[in-house]
């Protein structure tokens, strides 16, 4: 069985209430349910983790290498400045795909740069919750099923 960890960063626990004009009315719990439902027929275990604390996210990334085949991460605001999360992502030997619900390139200038993207295989931005599904599909189709070796 393949194991994938989905990490969500700060304020994503406020989805459904926070800036619905940008993020819609969907909650993080709804997103997690949609992801699980989409992959219910796969030989796949998906765990979800959310924290507003940078250190907890870093710890989870570092611990993940022992338990997971890959990570899907939405670092949220940390993506724009957290060298510590970037370093944690670089320190592990499993693939990471970065996801953003909104199109960060259509947002404020300071949101257009993702430092954490440097340690990601790729970034999916602007497709709402479906970005998580796209990331997991990529992982399953290109990394797990074909046994491709991924080098950061």
Swiss-Prot record:
Family: Belongs to the type-II 3-dehydroquinase family.
Record-linked Pfam families: DHquinase_II (PF01220)
GO MF entries: 3-dehydroquinate dehydratase activity
Record site: Transition state stabilizer: 18
EC number(s) reported in the record: 4.2.1.10
PROSITE patterns assigned: DEHYDROQUINASE_II
Domain of life: Bacteria
Entries under HAMAP family matching the protein: AroQ (MF_00169)
Catalyses which reaction(s): 3-dehydroquinate = 3-dehydroshikimate + H2O
Catalytic residues (UniProt): 23, 100
Gene: aroQ
Residues annotated for substrate binding in this entry: 74, 80, 87, 101-102, 111
Record function comment: Catalyzes a trans-dehydration via an enolate intermediate.
Keywords annotated in UniProt: Amino-acid biosynthesis, Aromatic amino acid biosynthesis, Lyase
Biological process according to GO: amino acid biosynthetic process; aromatic amino acid family biosynthetic process; chorismate biosynthetic process; quinate catabolic process
Organism annotation: Clostridium botulinum (strain Langeland / NCTC 10281 / Type F)
Protein name: 3-dehydroquinate dehydratase
Quaternary organization: Homododecamer.
Involved pathway(s): Metabolic intermediate biosynthesis; chorismate biosynthesis; chorismate from D-erythrose 4-phosphate and phosphoenolpyruvate: step 3/7
InterPro entries, per database record: DHquinase_II, DHquinase_II_CS, DHquinase_II_sf
């Amino acid at each position: 069985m393949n194991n994938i960890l989905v990490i969500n960063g700060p304020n994503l626990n406020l989805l459904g209430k926070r800036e619905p004009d940008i993020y819609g009315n969907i909650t993080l719990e709804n997103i997690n349910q949609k992801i699980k439902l989409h992959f219910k027929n796969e030989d796949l275990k998906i765990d979800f983790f959310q924290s507003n604390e940078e250190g907890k996210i870093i710890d989870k990334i570092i611990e993940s290498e022992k338990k997971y085949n890959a990570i899907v991460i939405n670092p949220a605001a940390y993506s724009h400045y957290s060298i510590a999360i970037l370093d944690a992502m670089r320190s592990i030997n499993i693939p990471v795909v970065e996801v953003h619900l909104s199109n960060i390139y259509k947002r404020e200038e300071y949101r257009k740069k993702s430092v954490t993207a440097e340690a990601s295989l790729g970034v999916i931005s602007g497709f709402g919750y479906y970005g998580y599904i796209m990331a997991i599909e990529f992982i399953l189709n290109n990394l797990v099923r074909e046994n491709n070796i991924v080098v950061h």
